[in-house]
C-alpha cells in the first residue's frame, strides 16, 4: 500500500507539467519586474508558493501598464504554451520600441515525446568550439522533488543575477516576442494581445555586446523550460569583447569543493551555484582549468585557414582587426588576436599600427593561388556564362543589401537563401565597398553601414527593372514551351533550374515572414518546374523547393518588390506540384508595447493616491 502511494505521488501528468511551467513563468516575469524596478514597489504583493516552498512578489493590475503585462502572460503566452506552439518567449527591455536592447530574458520551451521510454536533451558547447553532447534519461525518473529543486534553483539564480546588474535607465520600453515551432503552428495563428512580427522586428538589435548567461532549465517530463539572460547593464563591463566566450552557465554543479567568494551564493551543499565572470582565469583547487577554457588546436587551424583564404581573396593591401571581426562574427576577439599573431609569424601580414596590418600575399607559400576575376574581351561561352552568373549574383546581393541600414555576411547570406557561400558573400560585400555602396568602416554587431544616396537609390531601381524583365522572360518561356523541348531544358539549365517561386532569377523575394497565408489547395505549392526539372531540384539537398504564397500588404522596401506581379502571373500558369517544408519563420510581438517614463509613472501614482 505504501509503495503504491509513493508511485502515485511520483507520477507527473501533462497538466501538472503545464501548471508548473506556467507558475515558473509568472514567478520569473514578476521577479524581473520587481527587482529591475519596472513598476513601483506598491504594485507588488508578497505571495507564498507552497509547491516551491518560497515567497515571491506578485504583480497586481494597478494601472493599464501592469494590466497589459499580466494580459500578455495570462492570455497570450499561456495560450501558445497550452497548444504547444510556443518555442521561445523573449521578454525584452529596450530603449525604444524598435531601438537597441537593454536586457533580454529568453525562455525556451521544448515538448519531449513522453510516449517513448526516454527524454533526450541536446547540449551544445558555447564559444568557438563545435562540440556537442546528448544526454538521455528515462522519463519516469523525473520526480516532483527533482522538478521542485530545479525550479527553486533557477529562480534563486535569476534573482541573484539581477541583483548584480546596474540600475535600469529612466526611459525604457517593455515588450514581448514569441517564436513558434513552424511544423505545428498554423500560419494564421496569433495569440491574444499579439500581432504578426515582421522579419526585421523579430531580430533584436544591440548597440554593444551584452553579457550572456544561462540561468538554468527545468524538466517537468512533459515540458522543458530553459532560461538565458542578456544585459548591457553589467557593472563589470569591459565592453564584453569576448562575446562569444562570455556565455556563463549558472546552473552547472561541480563535484569539486571550490572556494566561494562574498559575491557568490551558496544556499546548500546540494544546490550550490556560482555567479562569477568567466574571464578564463578561474581555477579549481586542483589548479586545472575547466574544460570550456581548453583550446582545440585542430579547430584553431581550421579558423586560421579560413581567415588566411579570405585575406588572400581580397584586393586591398591593408587589413583592420575590425574587418576580421565583422566577416567572422563567430570568432571571439581573443581567437582573432591569436590568428593575427599566427599570420604575422607566417609572413602573410606585417604590422602597420596597433590594430592595422599590411598584407604580403606573396610571402605566404602555403596559401593556394587564387585567381582574380577579370573581365576580358574575348572569352569562351563557358567563361561568359560564369561572368553572367556572377553579375546576376551581385545584382541579387545589391537588391537585398541596398535597402538595409547595415549589411553583414550572416544577414546577406540568409537573404540569398544559400545561393552563395559565405566566402562568396564576403567578396560581394567587398565589391560593394569598392563600388561605393557600402562604407568600409564596420560595426562588429551590426556590420558595415550601407550608403543611402541618390546614386544608390537609382542603382536599386535599375536592379529592380532588370530583375523584372528577367522574370517576365523566364515566365514566357515556361508557359509557352513544352516540358520536353530541348530549348526549355537549355534555358533552365542556364538558370541553374531554379524552382518556380524564384523564377530563375531571385531567390526568396522579400521576407519569409510576410508570406504567411497559403493559397487554396488547388493552387497551393504551384511551381514552374515540371518533370525532369522538378526531380532535379529534389535531388539538390542544398535547396528546398519554395511554394508560392499569397502575400499580404507589405510596407518594407526589401519584401515588397515583385511580389504581386509574380504571384498574379503564377495564378494562371500551369505546372506540376512540389512540397514545401514550411520555410517561413513565424514570430509575434505585442500589439501595444509598454512605454515607461519615470515622470509619467510618478504622476500616475499620485493620481491613484488622491
Swiss-Prot record:
Region Disordered, residue ranges: 236-297, 477-507, 520-551
Biased composition (Acidic residues): 243-262
Main location: nucleus
Tissue specificity statement from the Swiss-Prot or TrEMBL entry: Expressed in anthers and ovules.
Keywords, ordered alphabetically: Centromere, Chromosome, Meiosis, Nucleus
Coiled-coil regions, chain positions: none
Record-given protein name: Meiosis-specific protein PAIR2
Upper lineage: Eukaryota, Viridiplantae, Streptophyta, Embryophyta, Tracheophyta
Gene name for this UniProt entry: PAIR2
Amino acid at each position: 500500500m505504501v509503495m503504491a502511494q509513493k508511485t502515485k505521488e511520483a507520477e507527473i501528468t501533462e497538466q501538472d507539467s503545464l501548471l508548473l511551467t506556467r507558475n515558473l513563468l509568472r514567478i520569473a516575469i514578476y521577479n524581473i519586474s520587481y527587482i529591475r524596478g519596472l513598476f513601483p514597489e506598491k504594485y507588488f504583493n508578497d505571495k507564498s508558493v507552497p509547491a516551491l516552498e518560497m515567497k515571491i512578489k506578485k504583480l497586481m493590475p494597478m494601472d493599464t501598464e501592469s494590466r497589459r503585462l499580466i494580459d500578455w502572460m495570462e492570455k497570450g503566452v499561456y495560450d501558445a504554451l497550452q497548444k504547444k506552439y510556443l518555442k521561445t518567449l523573449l521578454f525584452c527591455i529596450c530603449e525604444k520600441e524598435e531601438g537597441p536592447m537593454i536586457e533580454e530574458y529568453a525562455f525556451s520551451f521544448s515538448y519531449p515525446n513522453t510516449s517513448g521510454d526516454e527524454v533526450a536533451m541536446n547540449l551544445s558547447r558555447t564559444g568557438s568550439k563545435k562540440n556537442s553532447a546528448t544526454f538521455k534519461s528515462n522519463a519516469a525518473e523525473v520526480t516532483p522533488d527533482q522538478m521542485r529543486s530545479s525550479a527553486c534553483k533557477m529562480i534563486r539564480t535569476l534573482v541573484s543575477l539581477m541583483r548584480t546588474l546596474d540600475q535600469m535607465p529612466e526611459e525604457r520600453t517593455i515588450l514581448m516576442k514569441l517564436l513558434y515551432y513552424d511544423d505545428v503552428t498554423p500560419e494564421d495563428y496569433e495569440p491574444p494581445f499579439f500581432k504578426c512580427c515582421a522579419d526585421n522586428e523579430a531580430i533584436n538589435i544591440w548597440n554593444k555586446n551584452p553579457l550572456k548567461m544561462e540561468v538554468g532549465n527545468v524538466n517537468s517530463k512533459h515540458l522543458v523550460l530553459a532560461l538565458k539572460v542578456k544585459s548591457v547593464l553589467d557593472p563589470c563591463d569591459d565592453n564584453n569583447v569576448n562575446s562569444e566566450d562570455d556565455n556563463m552557465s549558472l546552473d552547472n554543479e561541480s563535484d569539486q569543493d571550490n572556494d566561494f567568494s562574498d559575491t557568490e551564493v551558496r544556499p546548500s551543499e546540494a544546490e550550490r551555484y556560482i555567479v562569477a565572470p568567466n574571464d578564463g582565469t578561474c581555477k579549481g583547487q586542483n589548479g586545472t582549468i575547466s574544460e570550456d577554457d581548453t583550446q582545440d588546436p585542430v579547430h584553431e587551424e581550421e579558423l586560421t585557414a579560413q581567415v588566411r583564404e579570405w585575406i588572400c581573396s581580397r584586393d586591398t593591401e591593408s587589413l583592420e582587426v575590425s574587418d576580421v571581426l565583422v566577416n567572422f562574427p563567430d570568432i571571439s576577439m581573443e581567437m582573432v588576436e591569436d590568428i593575427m599573431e599566427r599570420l604575422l609569424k607566417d609572413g602573410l601580414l606585417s604590422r602597420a599600427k596597433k590594430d592595422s596590418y599590411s598584407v604580403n600575399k606573396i610571402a605566404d607559400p602555403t596559401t593556394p593561388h587564387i585567381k582574380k576575376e577579370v573581365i576580358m574581351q574575348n572569352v569562351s561561352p563557358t567563361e561568359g556564362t560564369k561572368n553572367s552568373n556572377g553579375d546576376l549574383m551581385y545584382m541579387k546581393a545589391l537588391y537585398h543589401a541596398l535597402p538595409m541600414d547595415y549589411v553583414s555576411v550572416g544577414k546577406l547570406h540568409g537573404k540569398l537563401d544559400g545561393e552563395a557561400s559565405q566566402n562568396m558573400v564576403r567578396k560581394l560585400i567587398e565589391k560593394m565597398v569598392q563600388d561605393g555602396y557600402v562604407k568600409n568602416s564596420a560595426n562588429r554587431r551590426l556590420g558595415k553601414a550601407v550608403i543611402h544616396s541618390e546614386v544608390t537609390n537609382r542603382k536599386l531601381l535599375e536592379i529592380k527593372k532588370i530583375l523584372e524583365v528577367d522574370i517576365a522572360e523566364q515566365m514566357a518561356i515556361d508557359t509557352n514551351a513544352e516540358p520536353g523541348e530541348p530549348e526549355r531544358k537549355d534555358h533552365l539549365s542556364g538558370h541553374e533550374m531554379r524552382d518556380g517561386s524564384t523564377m530563375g532569377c531571385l531567390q526568396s523575394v522579400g521576407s519569409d515572414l510576410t508570406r504567411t497565408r497559403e493559397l487554396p489547395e488547388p493552387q497551393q505549392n504551384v511551381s514552374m518546374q515540371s518533370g525532369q526539372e522538378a526531380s532535379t531540384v529534389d535531388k539538390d539537398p542544398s535547396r528546398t523547393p519554395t511554394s508560392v504564397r499569397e502575400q499580404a500588404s507589405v510596407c518594407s522596401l526589401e519584401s515588397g518588390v515583385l511580389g504581386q506581379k509574380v504571384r498574379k502571373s503564377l495564378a494562371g500558369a500551369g505546372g506540376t506540384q512540389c512540397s514545401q517544408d514550411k520555410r517561413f519563420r513565424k514570430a509575434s510581438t505585442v500589439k501595444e508595447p509598454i512605454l515607461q517614463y519615470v515622470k509619467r509613472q510618478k504622476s500616475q501614482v499620485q493620481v491613484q493616491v488622491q
